[in-house]
């Protein structure tokens, strides 16, 4: 979901796949080698460098959005085998507060937990979209990136998405701090 782009604290590549830095005109791009032709059809390009995913691990990057200062090291490349080369660039953004794969990578790399969506599902005051339901800012985020010249592509993907069975509103994966009591340790026999 585009709304999680502004919550991303890392990028993730597949550790064993091949990635390339290519030059197209005056611009350079890093993406999975297997996806170059898909992303640059009928385009002349020069391969400047080749990498295995692990070569990119811990390389730092400049975030697209930086509404808060994370309390831990952020904005670097991580590796995980869940990243596939079926579409996109072979590089995914990681927002540990939104999604099981992202949360797992976040724990593995000790990434900061950035939560800019409140308990009602609305963007918080740190963002320009304060008070707006997070799914309603998807288009605005893409427009913002395009206006700044930072949107490479935004293809429409058809995939299943969870909706509330009662009111038909989109559901969001929302991680929050919780605690549990192991009652078997405190219960009298």
Regions found by a protein language model. Give the residues of each.
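NTP-handling and nucleic-acid-processing catalytic cores
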Residues: 2-120, 186-189
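A glycine-biased structural micro-motif
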Residues: 49, 53-58, 129-139, 147
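The substrate-binding groove and active-site-proximal loops of carbohydrate-active enzymes
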Residues: 91-93, 125-134
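Phosphate/diphosphate-binding loops
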Residues: 133-161
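Short cysteine/histidine-rich zinc-coordinating motifs and their immediately flanking basic loops
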Residues: 158, 176-180
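Short cysteine-rich clusters marking metal-coordination/redox-active sites
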Residues: 164
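Short Cys/His-rich metal-coordination motifs, predominantly Zn2+-binding knuckles/fingers
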Residues: 167
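Cys/His-rich microdomains that often coordinate metals
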Residues: 171
């Amino acid at each position: 979901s585009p709304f999680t782009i502004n919550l991303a604290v890392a990028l993730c590549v597949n550790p064993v796949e091949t990635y390339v830095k290519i030059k197209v005109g005056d611009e350079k791009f890093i993406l999975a080698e297997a996806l170059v032709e898909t992303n640059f059809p009928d385009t002349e390009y020069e391969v400047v460098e080749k990498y295995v995913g692990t070569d990119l691990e811990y390389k730092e990057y400049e975030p697209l959005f930086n509404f808060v200062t994370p309390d831990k090291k952020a904005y670097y490349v991580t590796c995980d085998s869940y990243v596939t080369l079926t579409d996109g660039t072979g590089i995914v953004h990681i927002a540990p507060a939104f999604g099981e794969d992202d949360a797992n990578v976040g724990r593995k790399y000790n990434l900061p937990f950035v939560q800019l969506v409140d308990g009602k599902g609305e963007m918080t005051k740190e963002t320009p979209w304060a008070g707006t339901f997070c799914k309603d800012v998807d288009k605005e985020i893409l427009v913002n990136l395009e206006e700044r010249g930072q949107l490479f592509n935004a293809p429409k993907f058809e995939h299943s998405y969870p909706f509330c069975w009662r009111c038909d509103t989109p559901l969001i994966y929302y991680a929050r701090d919780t605690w549990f009591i192991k009652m078997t340790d405190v219960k009298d026999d």
